[in-house]
Each structure stands twice: as structure tokens, then as C-alpha cells.
């Protein structure tokens, strides 16, 4: 059975991780908060802004709807900036009705970069 992973954040880091997962045979849903960015990714099958020269295989489904991105997945990779991580995880947990983690729902992996200056987190 093929695993499905949602990668939340289609910047350079999220796109690179989506490519690595797809090359490893994982079914990937790549989500971005910007409908314009999603449309560009779908049209060009390449992240020309953040990762030019790396075509996105058809096995990567590019979506703008967060609910669709995380529906029935085995894992969720949070590749959003550190400053957006709290809001993003809260939103995902609410959409999953609190079912996030290895015993209740998809496994979460946080790969956020950066630091929040006000909290140093």
C-alpha cells in the first residue's frame, strides 16, 4: 500500500522535500496558502520562484485546499516558516478533530526554518 504524505508549504524547502518523497515512491500532496502560487505550480509543474530547474512529477498533487491536502494522509510535513507554525498546526489539528499523531491520525513532521523573535521559538 502506497503511503500518502501532505507537504504543507511550497517554498524551496517544502518543494525539495516533496520531490524527495515522490522519488522515494510516496504519494505527495503539496499545499500552499497562495492560490496564485498553486496555479503557477500546476501550470508549469516546476517551482520557478523557489526551486527552478527541478520539474515536479505528476505523482505530486498540487493543491490549494488545506482540507483536501490533509484528507486521509499517513503523514503531514510542516514546511512553513517558524512564525506561521503555531497557526498552521492549530488549523490542521482543528480540521483533523484533534486526531494528529502516531496513535490517532497522521504522523506530523516539523521541518520549519527560522525563529520567532518575540518568543525565541
Where are these regions (language model features)?
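Rossmann-like NAD(P)(H) cofactor-binding subdomain of soluble oxidoreductases
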Residues: 70-71, 75-121
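Short secondary-structure boundary/capping segments
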Residues: 52-54, 68, 100
